[in-house]
Amino acid sequence: EFDLIVGHGTTLEHWELTIKFYLGIGDTTQTNAWFGPNPTDRLDLKLQRLLSHQMTLATTLAGQTLLKSQFGASNAEVKGIVKGRLFHPYSAWLDQQWQYPETIAADHLRGWWLTVDDFICRFNNGSPRFRPLTKRDWLSELQAVPVDERLPADRCLAALSSSREHYAHHVAMLDDNGLETSRGFVVMAPWLEVTQAQDQTV
């Protein structure tokens, strides 16, 4: 089905919309090096499906029939709109050494990722504080976080341990005033196992 049909002047436009979050591992200049929090989702596969299936819907007989019956036109200009955020390895993010595929906009939203062990090791001094992010928090920056929700790294992970997520946890890093300074993913062993296994088969 179409995501969105837009009338733009005398032109009919078919928009395919997607919001995705990908973590880069290995050679991050390649689209197959970017995996979702669920590592079965991969940037190159998503782009391939977007281009070969979703953005061709208007050229199918069913698509043209629907456009004709609903909008009086059998053709539509196609646009793919992909938004979201890329999460770079923490050291690359910290040094601003961002490497990403040439098809990605230079001003893309950025975050970082760490393994559980690296997260605890790097932030075991209790500073900065963090807040776990639920899915409804993923699209917008947090407002000032109450003091009792500003957690040190170990307590943040403890709070996340009760969730059913077993690949990666999304967290926001906070300043002393409880304002978000960045966001990232803390990935667990199963995420690394799946991404490394896929890397060997590419």
Which residue stretches match the model-derived regions?
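Intrinsically disordered, low-complexity Ser/Thr/Pro/Gly-rich regulatory segments
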Residues: E1-V202
